[in-house]
Amino acid sequence: GTTVGCTLNDEEFYRAFKKGAEPDLAAIRRFLDHNPAPYVSRSLDLRGPVSTINNACASGTDAVGQALEWIEEGLCELVIAGGTDEVSRIPYLGFSSLLNTSGRPCRPFDAGRDGLNLGEGAGVLIIEARASAERRGVRPLARLGGYGCSADAHHMTAPHPGGAGLERALRQALNGRDPADISFVNAHGTAT
């Protein structure tokens, strides 16, 4: 399987649209046709499910979560999962207009946090079922023990004050494990 998280940052389309022109929809079609993951899948002649996830800054994490679900459900033995994003004018100006960017280093869990820092990057993980790795004689570098994602629908931008959605996501991610046994948490910490 192949799953990639990404965002669409096509400035030419946006500029033409803002000028009242009828922009070429090729960029939108490329994006809607799930371009990144199918490209990787075709290039490597892979079989299995293919998905491109567009969920803003959570896309890469959600791609990894989907990979874990595919393996747990027996759809795949091995999944290439990753995420990519670029800094471009549209998201930069959007976040800047919300006055939630910071000139200081990002400190998402600090009481004195004052905003986010935009950046760009990409990362890919090869996620494989334990039985498949053992058959191939591969020693895993890490184990993905769980994944949790929850939208509590309390408010458009604010979570439920009691943390119901957060608790549900944490329980999903812990997957029945003791929190003391967890060595790494990939948290969505924007510092806003």
Question: Model segments located where?
Answer:
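Short, intrinsically disordered, charge-balanced linker/junction segments flanking boundaries
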Residues: 13-16, 187-192
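Condensing-enzyme catalytic core mediating Claisen C-C bond formation in acyl metabolism
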Residues: 101, 105-184
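Short, high-confidence coil segments that cap the C-terminus of an alpha-helix
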Residues: 76-77, 182
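Acidic, glycine-rich active-site loops and adjacent beta-strand->loop/helix elements
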Residues: 6-8, 55-59, 83-88, 146-151, ...
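Glycine-centered short loops/turns at secondary-structure junctions
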Residues: 74-75, 137
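Conserved catalytic cysteine-centered active-site region
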Residues: 6-18, 23-66, 75, 91-118
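Short coil-to-beta-strand
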Residues: 1-8, 38, 140-146
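Conserved small-residue
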Residues: 2, 40, 60, 67, ...
